[in-house]
């Protein structure tokens, strides 16, 4: 059963991956599943900022 993600632009994933951040948009990642969690919706261009929010990569502080 999917958990509720409380922050905007997050989605629950049963097979956790490697999230992009403002510091590194694409994070090299193995194919093994990490623990299930809420992750930023990478397919829509969202990455995790320093405050833990999911924002568009182009909106990251320069």
UniProtKB/Swiss-Prot annotation:
Subcellular location: Secreted
InterPro entries cross-referenced by the UniProt entry: Ser_inhib-like_sf (IPR036084), TIL_dom (IPR002919)
Transmembrane parts of this sequence: none
TIL domain location: 5-60
Primary localisation category: secreted
Disulfide bonds: 5-38, 15-33, 18-29, 22-60, 40-54
Highest taxon of source: Eukaryota
One CC-aspect GO term: extracellular region
CDD domains tied to this protein: TIL
GO molecular function, one term: serine-type endopeptidase inhibitor activity
UniProt entry tagged with the keyword Secreted: yes
Keyword terms, alphabetized: Disulfide bond, Protease inhibitor, Secreted, Serine protease inhibitor
Record-stated family: Belongs to the serine protease inhibitor-like (TIL domain-containing) family.
Protein name stated in the entry: Trypsin inhibitor
Organism: Ascaris suum
């Amino acid at each position: 059963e999917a958990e509720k993600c409380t922050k905007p632009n997050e989605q629950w994933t049963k097979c956790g991956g490697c999230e992009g951040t403002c510091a590194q948009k694409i994070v090299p990642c193995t194919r093994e599943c990490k623990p299930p969690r809420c992750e930023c919706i990478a397919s829509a261009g969202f990455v995790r900022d320093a405050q833990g929010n999911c924002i568009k990569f182009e909106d990251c502080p320069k």
